[in-house]
């Protein structure tokens, strides 16, 4: 026996089996008013006659007239879930949504059956057991395709195009997606190239990059301006101070001989210091020389005046000496002596020298007169002479 004969025998067994042997596991597969509403229109429609198609197919191939009676309805369908899933997967209603809608419209199948069959479909990745029912579902699918092809030939060849669309739908979707992705990538690359080539975009980018940097530079410039103002004020004060110093240095240059020829402040200061040191040495040398020539320079004027007063009261002085050194009372009356000590201190240098020289010359004259006369004057004469005013 061939495969088709085995399939026909198995088909008969399935048809002749009672419904009670298959307990309804799924409540959707049991007899219901919804199924009863379209069972007669689906299976007993004139346009959807499986009996005639099966007879013609079997007669053409094996010359065996095996009638396929489809008198059973949806309620007589076995409640095996595996069989239902396999039949739904390999049925011609699973070829695609477009093909199913077209077949339903051409065969007059109501929309409820399409919904029912879509709900009963299983995912493509589920594993199915190989068995005789798979062969039956394959044959049913082939017959449905043949029917669709015959209908398309009778109508003008539209069915063949629909079948091709169903077969190439998956390939078309994948190719379209690839094309779209490729187009998107190309468009993005073109945009990038255009942006890179266009000078305006580059200018905008540079401007956008320069804006934050410009803000930072502005703040930096403000800080530099403030610091510059502070430095300017400080520099002005420094300039004024340096000008004053330069003026004083010029004054010192005028005082110090030979300092005009020197350039540079440091060298000029050295010259001034050397000149001051030389002056100090000269003053010390002169003071030492004066002390050697006149050892009694540091005498007190008051003690000297007291000594003069005591000497004027003594009888040993001659007439000339009394006139040279008058008493203190006479000096005070004539106004020669002033009680202001400050004026005396100013003239102390000249007075000291004059008095010392006069004292020494008078002493020398006194000694010479004593040697000539050899006699001392009387006290009365001296007093009389002192009373006489010139």
UniProtKB/Swiss-Prot annotation:
Query: What are the GO BP annotations of this UniProt entry?
Result: positive regulation of flower development; regulation of DNA-templated transcription; response to blue light
Q: Name one Pfam family in it.
A: HLH
What is an example of a GO molecular function annotated in this UniProt entry?
DNA binding
Translocase as a keyword of this entry, yes or no, is no
Signal peptide location: none
Tissue specificity here reads: Expressed constitutively in roots, leaves, stems, and flowers.
**What's in the GO CC field?**
nucleus
Keyword list (alphabetical) reads:
DNA-binding, Growth regulation, Nucleus, Transcription, Transcription regulation
Domain bHLH residue range list:
229-279
Can you list the disulfide-bonded cysteine pairs? none
Where, per UniProt, does this protein localize? Nucleus
Q: Which residues form a coiled coil?
A: none
The regions listed as transmembrane in this protein's record are none
Residues covered by region (Disordered): 147-217
What is this protein for, i.e. what is its function? Answer: Transcriptional activator involved in cell elongation. Regulates the expression of a subset of genes involved in cell expansion by binding to the G-box motif. Binds to chromatin DNA of the FT gene and promotes its expression, and thus triggers flowering in response to blue light.
The UniProt record's further free-text remark is:
Plants over-expressing CIB5 show increased hypocotyl and cotyledon lengths and increased flower size.
Which protein is depicted? Transcription factor bHLH76
The protein's gene is named BHLH76
């Amino acid at each position: 026996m061939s495969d088709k004969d085995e399939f026909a025998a198995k088909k008969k067994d399935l048809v002749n089996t009672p419904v009670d042997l298959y307990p309804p596991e799924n409540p959707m597969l049991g007899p219901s008013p919804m199924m009863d509403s379209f069972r007669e229109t689906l299976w007993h429609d004139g346009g959807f006659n499986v009996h005639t198609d099966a007879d013609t197919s079997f007669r053409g191939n094996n010359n065996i007239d095996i009638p396929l009676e489809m008198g059973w309805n949806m309620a007589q369908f076995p409640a095996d879930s595996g069989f239902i899933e396999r039949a739904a997967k390999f049925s011609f209603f699973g070829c695609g949504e477009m093909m199913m809608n077209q077949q339903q419209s051409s065969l007059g199948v109501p929309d409820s059956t399409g919904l029912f069959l879509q709900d009963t479909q299983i995912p493509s990745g589920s594993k199915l057991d190989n068995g005789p029912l798979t062969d039956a579902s394959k044959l049913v699918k082939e017959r449905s395709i043949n029917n669709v092809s015959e209908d398309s030939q009778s109508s003008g060849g539209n069915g063949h195009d629909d079948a091709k669309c169903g077969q190439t739908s998956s390939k078309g979707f994948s190719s379209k997606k690839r094309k779209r992705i490729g187009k998107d990538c190309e468009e993005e690359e073109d945009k990038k190239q255009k942006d890179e080539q266009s000078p305006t975009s580059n200018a905008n980018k540079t401007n956008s990059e320069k804006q934050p940097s410009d803000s930072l530079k502005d703040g930096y410039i403000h800080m530099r301006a403030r610091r510059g103002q502070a430095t300017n004020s400080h520099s002005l004060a420094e300039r004024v101070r340096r000008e004053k110093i330069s003026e004083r240095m010029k004054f010192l240059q005028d005082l110090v001989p030979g300092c005009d020829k020197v350039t540079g402040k440091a060298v000029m200061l050295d010259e001034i210091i050397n000149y001051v040191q030389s002056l100090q040495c000269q003053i010390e040398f002169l003071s030492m020389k004066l002390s050697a020539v006149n050892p009694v320079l540091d005498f007190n004027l008051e003690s000297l005046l007291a000594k003069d007063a005591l000497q004027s009261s003594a009888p040993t002085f001659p007439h000339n000496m009394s006139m040279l050194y008058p008493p203190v009372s006479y000096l005070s009356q004539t106004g020669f002596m002033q009680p202001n000590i400050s004026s005396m201190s100013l003239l102390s240098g000249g007075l000291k020298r004059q008095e010392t020289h006069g004292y020494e010359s008078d002493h020398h004259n006194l000694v010479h007169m004593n040697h000539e006369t050899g006699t001392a004057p009387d006290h009365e004469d001296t007093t009389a002479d002192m009373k006489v005013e010139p």
